[in-house]
């Protein structure tokens, strides 16, 4: 229902307009206060890059963060990552992730990023505290990438990158809750790069698509072509589950059942195992896999995806960030 409201297919969005006007007024006032320096943002001693979005829901932001961290690491840059840690609840903050940190403590995306990149990752509702925790333990870190937080103006930033779903884009264009917007589309004029996941990019936007890899068995780590798996049940607890189901079909998989779950939904063995019958194979997102690995069964697999950015702009962006991190 919420997708229909935000896309404009349902007329119910009009009933929510008063709340949207209030949301827009408050969010605009907050940004203006920082712009006029009525409120002071904390500036880290190293450059900060924000990877965020203008809309609620999944846009492919986490794969972009992973891509960015890995690309900078390949260039010899030591990167740290901070996040709010949505979906997690730590005993205390800031929380610096380790191999023993669970998604219940830190949230799905931070654990996934930590496992994929081996970069220092810290979470805190106050992102400046997370930055301080990383720099205290890893003083050699040269640049911080913040996963989400475009609207978290308490943390000063040097570069802003926005990720857009190229198919859904901005829906009906209204602020939450009548529409998907956290900020209006005009905010794009002030950011450093706009990355468009799928769809048809517009002038000045960097095209991106998600490239699926081989399916990975949660229990054994065995890899295979996902099309070789039979009697597949697809499960996705991400911001926009239909994108994952479409990816499977693009890979030649016709799921016998598709199970969309809420983003950041907690998972347990009983609930997940009940999704498949004898002889069926469960295929999930990598984000779900970080929550299920501890209790996975032999017929559970996940399909990792990597961000693939096209054109000349990604190289220019990476050069800019490398020079920034190097102090040039």
UniProtKB/Swiss-Prot annotation:
Record family assignment: Belongs to the LpxK family.
Alphabetized UniProt keyword annotations: ATP-binding, Kinase, Lipid A biosynthesis, Lipid biosynthesis, Lipid metabolism, Nucleotide-binding, Transferase
GO biological process assignments: lipid A biosynthetic process; lipopolysaccharide core region biosynthetic process
Pathway: Glycolipid biosynthesis; lipid IV(A) biosynthesis; lipid IV(A) from (3R)-3-hydroxytetradecanoyl-[acyl-carrier-protein] and UDP-N-acetyl-alpha-D-glucosamine: step 6/6
Cited function: Transfers the gamma-phosphate of ATP to the 4'-position of a tetraacyldisaccharide 1-phosphate intermediate (termed DS-1-P) to form tetraacyldisaccharide 1,4'-bis-phosphate (lipid IVA).
Organism for this UniProt entry: Escherichia coli (strain K12)
A Gene Ontology cellular-component term: membrane
Record field: catalytic activity: lipid A disaccharide (E. coli) + ATP = lipid IVA (E. coli) + ADP + H(+)
Pfam families according to UniProt: LpxK
Residues that bind ATP: 55-62
UniProt protein name: Tetraacyldisaccharide 4'-kinase
Enzyme class, spelled out: transferase
Lineage per the UniProt record: Bacteria, Pseudomonadati, Pseudomonadota, Gammaproteobacteria, Enterobacterales
EC code(s) of this entry: 2.7.1.130
Gene Ontology molecular function: any one: kinase activity
InterPro entries hit by this protein: LpxK, P-loop_NTPase
């Amino acid at each position: 229902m919420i997708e229909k409201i935000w896309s404009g297919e349902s007329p119910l969005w009009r009933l929510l307009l008063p709340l949207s006007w209030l949301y827009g007024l408050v969010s605009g006032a907050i940004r203006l206060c920082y712009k006029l320096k009525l409120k002071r943002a904390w500036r880290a001693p190293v450059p900060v890059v924000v990877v965020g979005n203008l809309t609620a829901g999944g846009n492919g932001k986490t794969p972009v963060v992973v891509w960015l961290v890995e690309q900078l690491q390949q260039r010899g840059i030591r990167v740290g990552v901070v996040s709010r840690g949505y979906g997690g609840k730590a005993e205390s903050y800031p929380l610096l992730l380790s191999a023993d940190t669970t998604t219940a403590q830190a949230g799905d995306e931070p654990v996934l990023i930590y496992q994929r990149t081996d970069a220092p990752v810290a979470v805190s509702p106050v992102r400046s505290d997370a930055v301080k925790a990383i720099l205290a333990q890893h003083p050699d870190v040269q640049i911080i990438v913040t996963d989400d937080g475009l609207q978290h103006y308490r943390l000063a930033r040097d570069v802003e990158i926005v990720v857009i779903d190229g198919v859904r884009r901005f829906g009906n264009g209204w602020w939450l809750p009548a529409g998907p917007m956290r900020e209006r589309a005009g905010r794009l004029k002030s950011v450093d790069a706009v990355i468009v996941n799928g769809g048809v990019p517009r002038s000045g936007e960097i095209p991106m698509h998600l490239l699926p890899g081989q399916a990975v068995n949660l229990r054994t780590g065995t890899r295979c072509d996902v099309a070789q798996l039979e009697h597949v049940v697809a499960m996705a607890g991400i911001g926009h589950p239909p994108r994952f189901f479409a990816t499977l079909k693009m890979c030649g998989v016709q799921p016998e059942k598709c199970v969309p779950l809420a983003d950041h939904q907690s998972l347990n063995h009983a609930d997940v195992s009940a999704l498949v019958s004898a002889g069926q194979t469960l295929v999930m997102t990598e984000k779900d896999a970080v929550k299920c690995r501890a209790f996975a069964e032999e017929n559970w697999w996940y399909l990792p995806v990597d961000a693939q950015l096209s054109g000349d702009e990604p190289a220019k962006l990476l050069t800019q960030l490398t020079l920034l991190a190097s102090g040039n």
